[in-house]
A protein has these predicted regions:
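Aromatic-lined, polymer-binding surfaces characteristic
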Residues: 64-160
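Generic preference for well-ordered secondary structure
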Residues: 23-26, 42, 60-64, 100, ...
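Repeat-mediated protein-protein interaction surfaces in helical alpha-solenoids
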Residues: 53-61
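Extreme N-terminal leader/anchor segments
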Residues: 1-54
Length: 160
């Protein structure tokens, strides 16, 4: 019963409004892959993103749960060649934001969301740099929103 009520709340307009409050106006983040080497397994074989088609990837209902998590946590960005088109990566993120800007239990699952934030912020050369102001605003907003969601989840764990 409590889980059902919590799930209703997490999918509500009130919860979306709660985690949609921006707390910083812009993102200034430059990362080093060395800092996260203990968390992330970086592949030596690099992939060029321009060799793939990602038009309907976020709406593909044929993915297994494992494939869905791998796709949505964005850790595959660590396998990309830095010579890949940043505009292609940014378009993929932009599409993800359009479809997943509101909480859903599957794409906003705690582990998946935390990995997605790590991936996006660690790979700013592809995910953020050389993008439009509109994209940066949307990116900053969704990073903050996901962070607030994670903080909310952590705070709720402490209560139980």
């Amino acid at each position: 019963m409590l889980g059902t009520l919590r799930n209703l709340y997490l999918n509500s307009f009130l919860y979306d409004k709660k985690i949609s409050k921006p707390f910083i106006s812009s993102l200034k983040y430059k990362s080093s892959t060395y800092l996260l080497s203990s968390l992330v397994k970086i592949q030596t074989k690099k992939i060029n993103i321009d060799e793939f088609v990602f038009d309907a990837v976020w709406t593909n209902g044929n993915l297994s749960n494992k494939q869905f998590k791998k796709l949505n946590n964005f850790f595959w960005i660590f396998s990309l060649d830095l010579k890949s088109s940043s505009s292609s990566v940014q378009k993929i993120i932009e599409n993800w934001i359009e479809i997943n800007s509101k909480y859903t239990s599957k794409s906003w699952e705690f582990d998946t969301t935390s990995k997605r934030i790590i991936s996006w912020l660690t790979n700013t050369k592809l995910t953020y740099d050389n993008s439009s102001e509109e994209y940066k605003n949307n990116f900053n907003f969704i990073i903050q929103k996901q962070t607030l969601h994670l903080l909310n989840q952590i705070n709720n764990l402490k209560k139980y």
